[in-house]
Structures are given as structure tokens and as C-alpha cells.
Amino acid sequence: MNTFSQVWVFSDTPSRLPELMNGAQALANQINTFVLNDADGAQAIQLGANHVWKLNGKPDDRMIEDYAGVMADTIRQHGADGLVLLPNTRRGKLLAAKLGYRLKAAVSNDASTVSVQDGKATVKHMVYGGLAIGEERIATPYAVLTISSGTFDAAQPDASRTGETHTVEWQAPAVAITRTATQARQSNSVDLDKARLVVSVGRGIGSKENIALAEQLCKAIGAELACSRPVAENEKWMEHERYVGISNLMLKPELYLAVGISGQIQHMVGANASQTIFAINKDKNAPIFQYADYGIVGDAVKILPALTAALAR
């Protein structure tokens, strides 16, 4: 048996749902999708869900992951085994841990390949900071996986599809985190997973102010702007959602233009599936040139304006 009888899908990030649903179609005979509202439920059915389970009734001061108890109960009530697919977001991983505990299931994070053999999931993901690929065969009846971005192609919606909708009512867990305040995230919404052209900046750009040079290039060629982890996590020059690497975005654009990025393996595992890699770096020995199809050795601050002017003609 090379498929599960049932798969359960949930995504806290709407843009990740289509790829999870495509993976679900390949891995199981029946697709169940947990959603938070009616609009997400309608989308899930168009993407292939046979059953939609609307999570309902959570108080405003409680966290989404507090639904883990009723989600696990619902999963157990509809089969003695199954596969759970979640995005490898922070919330996805937290929810995976809670579901794993309640389902007595093995949990595997950041899966880049998933297959089913004899009714059991086999998972591959990066280990040792991206230096190797590890393979795990999950022996527990339930398997809970968080999936790396780009592991599956996005499913295409079909408005003619039909499915059943159910409601799962909130039940307060015995121990829970209460949210006391919410601060709006200062971020420009962008779906880098779908970008054809990506310009990505590293610390070699020199300063936060110099990122404007990369933004001008993006505008000239219709690209999206990304960055390396140090730019987002250490320097705080850009949003966390834009950094490319093993623990975040795994991109497959037609063009990946790396500006001032050294090319460490932890970054490149998120970019080396690009059709073409173009690197700009003032260090001729930078590892990025081992991956690049094309490269320029020089100061990005001087090269970017000239490149933008040439491509804008």
C-alpha cells in the first residue's frame, strides 16, 4: 500500500495550503482539511478536500494551537492511522508537537520529500545544518509532518469540486497560553514561493539603506526581494518572512540574483533549485560562485545601479 487511507491538512498560512493539498492528493485516498473560516473551507474543497472541518469558537485571547486537543480527537474518531501535513512555520511546528503528543505519533519537521511504503511514511529532510540529507521511516500509526516550502507544487483550484463541511467546536485545554496583547506585524505581504525572479541580498550589501538599490533593480525587472538569514535575524534589516535558507524559504524561481551573499550551504539549500543563479560579490573566493551560473566580482553598491540602468532600457 503506497498511500494512507486518510490525510489531515492544516495551514496557518493561506498561501501554503495549495502545495499541502497537492501533496495530500499524492499521499492519501481521502483528504480532510481543518480550516478557520468559511472562505478557507471553500478554497480547500476547490483544492481537493473531501471533508472540511471548520474549527469554531476559540476565544480571542487563546492561541490557534489550543485547537490541538479537538483536532486530535477528530483525527482519532475517523481512523486508527493517518497522515497529518502542516507547513513548517513556527505555528505549524508548535501544533505538530502538540498533535504528536496527543496522537502518540512520531513528528518529523522540515520534510523535503515524502513517500509512503507499506502504509508507513518515509521522510527526507536536511540534517547537520544542510550538510546532509537524513531519511526517516515513521513506524507509528499516525505520522505528523511539517513540510518545507516548495516540497510540492501548488494544487490548482477546481470550482466544480464538491465536499462535505463539518464543524469542530472549541474545547478549552487543561493547560493553555492566554494571549494578553497583539501587535500588528510590520511586513509587506509577498508570496516569494510564486516569484519567477528573485533578487536576494546578504550582509555584503553593506547597510540597510543600500537595500534600496536592490529594490530599484526589483522594480526594473519585476522581481521580488528576498534576503539571507543574517540580514533578517541578526541585522534586522528585513522581515523574517523574506529570508531564504534551510530553516525558512526554499525557492525555485527562474532567476535567483544573489547580491552580497557569501553562499553558505544553509542558505544555498533554499536557493539551489533555481533555474539560473546569478551572483554579485566582491570576494572572488566566495562559495556562492560554486553554485552560480553567472557571476560578477565587484562591489554591489556600484554594480547594482549600473545593472538597473542597463536592464531598465
Curated annotation (Swiss-Prot):
Q: Which cysteines are joined by disulfide bonds?
A: none
Alphabetized, the UniProt keywords read: Electron transport, FAD, Flavoprotein, Transport
Q: Which SMART domains match?
A: ETF
Its GO biological process terms?
carnitine catabolic process; carnitine metabolic process; fatty acid beta-oxidation using acyl-CoA dehydrogenase
Segments passing through the bilayer? none
Q: Would you say which domain of life the source belongs to? A: Bacteria
The family database entries (Gene3D superfamilies) matched by this protein are listed as: HUPs, TPP-binding domain
Read off the Pfam families from this record: ETF, ETF_alpha
Does the record's keyword annotation contain Transport? yes
Pathway linked to the protein: Amine and polyamine metabolism; carnitine metabolism
Example GO molecular function term? electron transfer activity
Keyword Metal-binding on entry: no
- Where along the chain is FAD bound? 255-283
Its annotated function is as follows: Required for anaerobic carnitine reduction. May bring reductant to CaiA.
Oligomer and partners: Heterodimer of FixA and FixB.
Family recorded in the similarity comment: Belongs to the ETF alpha-subunit/FixB family.
Q: Which HAMAP family match?
A: FixB (MF_01056)
Q: What is this protein called?
A: Protein FixB
